[in-house]
Amino acid sequence: MARQRNASHDRPEGGALNAAISEVVVRLMAQRTGRGPTKARTTIDRDVIVVVLQNTLTSGEQFLVDRDHSEQVLDMRRAYQEAMRTDCIAAVEALTDRTVTAFMSANHIEPDLAAEVFVLEPEAPAPV
């Protein structure tokens, strides 16, 4: 069921919403992993939000990658992302005032990138 918009709260829109989502995802990653990405870009297209993060690896993870342990780092990143799922969804729902129906995460080692994808419940049509 689609959330009802709450007009009493000023919610960010447009570029401000994109920036707010990027900031909250970076902050959550920093709190949970000890270091946040150095770059983040959020794109919103109707019911899909994609956050692309750059330079995400901690120094410990980079040390392991440099010694051919990329798979172990990717496994650990998947565990972090699964553990952060609830917090990420709650943050995006609070910022957009919409329900997240699906959340997906992926990481890439070289180049050092991550993507967080949020699928939103479609907005209810405006009353006529």
Where are these regions (language model features)?
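Interaction-mediating elements
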Residues: M1-V128
